[in-house]
């Protein structure tokens, strides 16, 4: 799901070690060449630029490579795994505590009816080809994304209009109070230099320029010497794309300065490296279809589940999940309990937090008439207390979480069968069968996307659920004239004292854990304070790579 913004500073837990003897000194460049890349300019050393003190080599997973290039219209910066676009500038930015701040914008205001946003643009900003950045470029960017974006919803935008060279107006189809969050991740492109090949050869005004892209291998970014803001400390950033085991091998060989890793590697130690763990809102949870079986949608997809449609069942499951056990046994201790899709966000309602209470869960089921059978599985009116829990085939963490869930719920008298499936069938099957998902974005729209009735539909998009009061709160939040005031409405959608989607409410989703993002970091590398990472273990880590340094 598309998302925006990041939150409070991450936590770094360090573990020194003594496995292996990595070659090279702290910050040594040239990792791509050393790791077998035949490119004549792989890494800073081979390119003849940068030093051990102003360059860094970062390893990300293969899926982090932007398939369509560095074009905001095709997911760069503003796709599922949101991050700052680096090559382009944005109108706004977010601070470590999720406050909105300005980048290209110098001021903004919204009309009383919420249908017009007026943004003033800073003077003196130029694209890397020397042409000035004006409000015309801003309007062009947003209108282009409205018409062509393949990954984001811009239906709320009617039109962007350049009033003059340094003022742009956004005319909205409907009030959208969280528009500043969208402005924080949309990179501005030059109208004069934009075309079909833009993603391969981007021109921007951001902190970095694309110097080289060896597809399937690496991206090399070079600091923009004419950047209008504070000059980047890291003059060259090399991003290598590797599978998890290859990333660890690169660390063992001393060929990476910072490399992503998984909790399964968390109990290892590597000489010359620290293990950093950053908190996230990268959550895992599963949907529980909230209507009875027997109906279909307009495409004939079966809807509903005769077991999970009982709200007492959903509440009992929420109480019966030992999240701390999952963190220790599945995540090796690297995670936090998840109670909602937006833990720790300014719009998070703490009423979502639940204490592990299997006894109360059992009482709820008893009182609701779910009787324990001789086989240890409950039953009511001929319906067995059972369901299949799907997970994305090939995702070992989701599989382990699903199996742990099944084991825990068995003690409650619920029989859960786990099944790995492909995404080609998951979306349709999830309308009647629980599916373990990964979510987490820096925008309240994540709540809307999960719980609000789909436009023109009868139920929410990803799992059949409907609550008119919840919908109303979210509609009012979007229509609010104040971003801060909207937070309270988002909280009420979660729980207002009588209804909502949390503990004592409808519980159409069960949230399990927020997964820490882990990285091997070469000793001496000072990674700047991290915002709370969103879903995805990729480009978010380098949101502020320009502020990193070497000791």
Segments predicted by a language model, with ranges:
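Ligand/substrate-recognition segments at binding pockets and active sites
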Residues: 371-441, 517
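Surface-exposed binding/hinge segments that line
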Residues: 109-116, 152-193
């Amino acid at each position: 799901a598309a998302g925006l913004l990041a939150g409070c500073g991450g936590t770094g837990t360090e573990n020194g070690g003594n496995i292996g003897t990595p070659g090279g000194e702290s910050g040594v460049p040239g990792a791509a060449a050393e790791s077998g890349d035949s490119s004549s300019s792989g890494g800073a050393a081979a390119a003849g630029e940068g030093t051990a003190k102003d360059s860094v080599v970062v390893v990300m997973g293969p899926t982090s490579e932007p398939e369509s290039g560095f074009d905001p219209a095709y997911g760069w910066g503003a796709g599922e795994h949101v991050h700052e676009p680096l090559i382009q500038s944005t109108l706004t930015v977010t601070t470590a505590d999720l406050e909105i701040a300005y980048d290209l914008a110098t001021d903004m205001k919204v009309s009383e009816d919420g249908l017009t946003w007026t943004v003033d643009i800073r003077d003196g900003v130029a694209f890397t080809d020397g042409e000035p950045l004006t409000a015309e470029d801003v309007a062009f960017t947003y209108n282009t994304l409205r018409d062509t974006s393949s990954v984001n919803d811009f239906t709320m935008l009617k039109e962007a209009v350049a009033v003059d060279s340094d003022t742009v107006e956004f005319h909205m189809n409907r009030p959208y109070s969280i528009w500043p969050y969208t402005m924080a991740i949309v990179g501005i492109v030059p109208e004069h230099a934009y075309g079909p090949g833009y993603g391969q050869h981007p021109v921007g005004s951001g902190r970095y320029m694309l110097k080289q892209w060896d597809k399937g291998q690496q991206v090399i970014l070079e600091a923009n010497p004419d950047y209008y803001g504070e000059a980047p400390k890291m003059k060259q950033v090399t991003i290598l794309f590797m599978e998890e085991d290859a990333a660890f091998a690169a660390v063992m060989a001393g060929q990476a300065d910072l490399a992503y890793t998984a909790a399964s590697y968390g109990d290892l130690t590597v000489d010359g490296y620290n293990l950093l763990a950053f908190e996230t809102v990268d959550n895992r949870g599963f949907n529980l279809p909230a209507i009875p079986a027997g109906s279909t949608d307009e495409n004939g997809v079966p809807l509903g589940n005769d077991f999970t449609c009982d709200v007492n069942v959903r509440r009992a499951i929420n109480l019966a999940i030992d999240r701390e056990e999952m963190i220790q046994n599945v995540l090796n201790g690297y995670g936090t309990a998840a109670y909602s899709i937006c833990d720790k966000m300014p719009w998070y309602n703490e009423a979502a937090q639940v204490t592990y209470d299997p006894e109360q869960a059992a009482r709820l089921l008893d009182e609701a008439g779910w009787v324990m059978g001789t086989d240890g599985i409950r039953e009511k009116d001929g319906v067995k207390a059972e369901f299949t829990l799907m997970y994305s085939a090939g995702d070992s963490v989701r599989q382990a979480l699903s199996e742990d869930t099944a084991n825990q719920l068995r003690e409650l008298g619920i029989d859960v069968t786990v099944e790995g499936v492909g995404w080609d069938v998951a979306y349709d099957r999830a309308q009647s069968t629980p599916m373990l998902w990964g979510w987490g974005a820096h925008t309240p729209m994540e709540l809307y996307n999960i719980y609000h009735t789909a436009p023109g539909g009868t139920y929410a998009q990803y799992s059949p659920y409907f609550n008119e009061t919840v919908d109303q709160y979210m509609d009012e939040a979007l229509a609010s004239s104040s971003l801060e005031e909207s937070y309270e409405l988002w909280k009420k959608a979660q729980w207002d004292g009588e209804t909502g989607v949390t503990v004592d409410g409808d519980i159409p989703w069960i949230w399990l854990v927020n997964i820490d993002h882990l990285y091997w970091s070469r000793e001496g590398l000072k990674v700047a304070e991290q915002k709370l990472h969103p879903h995805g273990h990729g480009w978010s880590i380098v949101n502020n790579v320009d502020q990193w340094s070497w000791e």
